[in-house]
A protein has these predicted regions:
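Short Gly/Pro-enriched turn/cap motifs at secondary-structure boundaries
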Residues: 210-214, 246-247, 291-295
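Short beta-strand or tight-loop elements
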Residues: 136, 237, 299-301
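Conserved active-site and cofactor/substrate-binding residues in soluble primary-metabolism enzymes
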Residues: 25, 135, 159-166, 213-221, ...
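N-terminal Rossmann-like NAD(P) cofactor-binding subdomain of oxidoreductases
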Residues: 1-213, 231-234, 306-308, 343-345
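C-terminal substrate-binding/catalytic lobe of Rossmann-fold NAD(P)-dependent dehydrogenases
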Residues: 215-285
Length: 346
């Protein structure tokens, strides 16, 4: 197995990639992005349920002709990179196996996102490979690019946390967030391919409804990462997070209502966000409210900060399958391999 050396791909040799779990929405998109990436070679795609089928039969729009196989870690040879698109719990053993083979890994599940093991166990159950937690890097490049560059295991963020953290990070870093209410809305693809009755056409069409308004698994992820960048003694005292399912296939909007610790003007608020994101190629600061359609099929996040009547309000939109999952995985992988982070996703 090839050892992790940087940069891979810049000498003309493509990094060889396996996508494990390529039949879900995020896994299939990841496979397509790798397939079309100039510095990556997609050598294998796997499925736990649809082996023997070519991916382009399940997703004709992607045009990936490789046949889905059953994952056989012992049989992998000369593979540099693993992208794991398994559900939480099922992903960790696969990640551990790939790391044992010397592969660098981007994991799309929640298994390595949380630093605090008891918090993980509270929301997801027992962890099969907790020893890997300390070496995992949270893969939000706009938050911790330097750590991503040096990482060998990336915990790709959740879709809601990606949008919410990007929306709120400048305020958190300034120690300004006292209390925040996050009203989030996501397309149906965010629930995954096997969503069941709750995400069926009959249920979601012409309908908007909250789900898991208390105890949603993404709340501790958002809170942990924002408090990690907050000054000592100026963490977030209270957070309410309520997601909603809206009748669109993909896209995500978060509206964040922030009680700030000290008054701030609109000019100062915009300057705070410009100082934080002015050099970020995938973050666009807006003067008008953004919509889901503005970022569909892109790795972009559009943000509008506003001083409202009683609170600071921050809107952010992403494509939940792209920046919220698969294209962010490629952004992370580009950085890990010493490539320009926009290759294959710009």
């Amino acid at each position: 197995m090839a050892e992790h050396t940087q940069p891979i791909g810049l000498d003309g040799a493509k990094a060889r990639v396996i996508v494990a779990g390529a039949t879900g929405y995020a896994g299939a998109l990841a496979a397509n992005l790798v397939w079309n990436h100039p510095a990556l070679e997609l050598v294998e795609i796997t499925s736990r349920s649809e082996t023997g089928t070519a991916l382009n039969e399940l997703y004709p729009r992607y045009g990936v002709p490789l046949e889905l196989k059953e994952l056989d870690l012992a049989g992998l040879e000369n593979v540099d990179v693993g992208i794991v698109a398994y559900p939480h719990g099922a992903a960790a053993p696969v990640v551990a196996g790939m790391r044992g083979l010397g592969m660098i890994v981007v994991d799309l599940s929640a298994d390595f996102r949380l630093d605090d093991l008891p918090t993980y166990e509270k929301f997801y159950g027992a962890h099969s490979d907790p020893d890997l937690l300390d070496g995992a890097v949270y893969g939000l490049p706009e938050l911790n690019r330097a750590d991503v560059i040096d990482a060998e295991l990336i915990a790709n963020p959740g879709c809601y946390p990606t949008a919410a953290i990007l929306a709120l990070a400048p305020l958190a870093e300034a120690g300004l967030i006292d209390d925040v209410v996050i009203d989030a809305k996501s397309g149906v693809s965010g629930a995954g391919r096997g969503g069941g009755e709750g995400t069926s056409f009959v249920t979601v069409t012409e309908n908007v409804a909250p789900y898991k308004p208390a105890g949603h698994r993404h709340r501790p992820e958002i809170l942990e990462k924002l408090n990690k960048v907050s000054p000592d003694g100026a963490g977030i005292d209270s957070m309410t997070f309520v997601p909603h399912l809206v009748p669109v296939d993909q896209g995500e909007l978060v509206s964040c209502y922030v009680k700030v610790r000290e008054e701030i003007s609109q000019d100062a608020l915009e300057a705070l966000y410009e100082a934080r994101y002015g050099g970020e190629r995938f973050v666009t600061l807006r003067k008008t409210p953004p919509g889901m359609r503005d970022v569909r099929g892109t790795n972009e996040c559009h943000i509008m900060p506003l001083v409202g009547d009683d609170r600071v309000v921050v809107f952010a939109v992403i494509d939940n399958l792209w920046k919220g999952a698969s294209s962010q995985a490629i952004q992370n992988l580009n950085l890990m391999l010493g490539l320009d982070e926009g290759v294959g996703i710009s």
